[in-house]
Amino acid sequence: MDQSNRYARLDLQEADLIAGGRHVLCAYVMKPKAGYGYLETAAHFAAESSTGTNVEVSTTDDFTRGVDALVYEIDPEKEIMKIAYPVELFDRNIIDGRAMLCSFLTLTIGNNQGMGDVEYAKMHDFYVPPCYLRLFDGPSMNIADMWRVLGRDVRNGGMVVGTIIKPKLGLRPKPFADACHEFWLGADFIKNDEPQGNQTFAPLKETIRLVADAMKRAQDETGEAKLFSANITADDHYEMVARGEYILETFGENADHVAFLVDGYVTGPAAITTARRQFPRQFLHYHRAGHGAVTSPQSMRGYTAFVLSKMARLQGASGIHTGTMGYGKMEGEAADKIMAYMLTDEAAEGPFYRQTGWGSKATTPIISGGMNALRLPGFFDNLGHSNVIQTSGGGAFGHLDGGTAGAKSLRQSHEAWMAGVDLVTYAREHRELARAFESFPADADKFYPGWRDRLHRAA
């Protein structure tokens, strides 16, 4: 059934929809299956995403038609489809009237993903009007709160130097805590890897107790504050809360040095909201393990990593992993920096829309995946600043002189970039950084040709 007479309004102008302030706008890359027209399929998509079904129903009235989702722009050659969703369509909490991301997803990327006339459809961007934007929680904490704990400038404190304890599984409590202590002697921040929790060989309560002790010892030995991101991911709301409360109790006076990591993609919006609302004084660390199943450029359905990042800020993530923008081992490219800008700026350009009016704290980009001291300067050059959390697993513990030296090499790389000094030149007077060149020779050869002669040349 062709529903384009009802669910398509190509005379609508995007600027007018934005000025009107009552529509969420979504841009998709969509291809109909063979034999289906583009506008017909787009209209069916909008109908299935809002008030329609595959037939006319007798219960439809004028009010219902007034909240139809509408296709307002198509470009069949580029496979671009844009849809305007009235904000009235989206579900609200009965306890406080707040918005919920699960409703946003159910409409904009729900049943439409399985339609028989759609070859593929993927959301690449969305715009949220101010009246709906302010109904989301937004972040309660971000990198500025970490800088405060670390004793830095809370406006421009620079990179928080971190690691992921490796191997990601298989370490028992004491070796895990020992690795934490080793890294903390040289840098700032340690996170659980996403599967680390309460395995039988590493009970959470024992591990956390030893990690809290390792933090105290490292702080005493260095005179510096240290940070830990503890995984509280669980299927059950009460389990998440129980883990969080135990962790805070165990860290005691260092409770504000603790972030809570949640695997937000695999557990969904409910887990992120649980952490955001139950623990508003903790940094909420959104790990996105599994997201590549829908966000990868190889996947033609779902949504992009940019969309995921923007949704994370709406929900209140303090920080979210954004990949390495082509500078590490994970899928990505330099242009992915627009994700970071959407997370941090009050107004930012997306692939299709300019989002304004955040009115909330920024969300911190978390950089991880194949990074080491040699790759950082290029990454910072591309991004234009270094106000990120950066976690290197192999980049720290793959250092020839161990985790402490690896941690120091990451700090030294950041110091060199901040000072505008060439990395090889800086390494001549910083042994840990110099040894990073020897630890990662393939990267050294790629990014710093002739480094061996330059490094050992007299200053």
Curated annotation (Swiss-Prot):
Required cofactor(s): Mg(2+)
Cofactor annotation remark: Binds 1 Mg(2+) ion per subunit.
InterPro entries in the cross-refs: RuBisCO, RuBisCo_large_chain_AS, RuBisCO_lsu_C, RuBisCO_lsu_C_sf, RuBisCO_lsu_fd_N, RuBisCO_lsu_N_sf, RuBisCO_lsuII
Binding residues for Mg(2+): K191, D193, E194
Chain coiled-coil ranges: none
PROSITE patterns cross-referenced by the UniProt entry: RUBISCO_LARGE
Reactions mediated catalytically: 2 (2R)-3-phosphoglycerate + 2 H(+) = D-ribulose 1,5-bisphosphate + CO2 + H2O; D-ribulose 1,5-bisphosphate + O2 = 2-phosphoglycolate + (2R)-3-phosphoglycerate + 2 H(+)
Binding positions (substrate): N111, K168, R288, H321, S368
Cleavable signal peptide: none
Any GO BP annotation: reductive pentose-phosphate cycle
Enzyme active site: K166 (proton acceptor), H287 (proton acceptor)
SUPFAM superfamilies noted in UniProt: RuBisCo, C-terminal domain, RuBisCO, large subunit, small (N-terminal) domain
Site positions for Transition state stabilizer: K329
Modified residues (N6-carboxylysine): K191
GO MF annotation: an example: magnesium ion binding
EC numbers for this chain: 4.1.1.39
Alphabetized UniProt keyword annotations: Calvin cycle, Carbon dioxide fixation, Lyase, Magnesium, Metal-binding, Monooxygenase, Oxidoreductase, Photosynthesis
Broad EC category: lyase
NCBIfam families: PRK13475.1
Miscellaneous information on this protein: The basic functional RuBisCO is composed of a large chain homodimer in a 'head-to-tail' conformation. In contrast to form I RuBisCO, the form II RuBisCO are composed solely of large subunits.
Subunit structure: Homodimer.
Family to which the UniProt record says this protein belongs: Belongs to the RuBisCO large chain family. Type II subfamily.
Task performed by this protein: RuBisCO catalyzes two reactions: the carboxylation of D-ribulose 1,5-bisphosphate, the primary event in carbon dioxide fixation, as well as the oxidative fragmentation of the pentose substrate. Both reactions occur simultaneously and in competition at the same active site.
Protein name, as recorded: Ribulose bisphosphate carboxylase
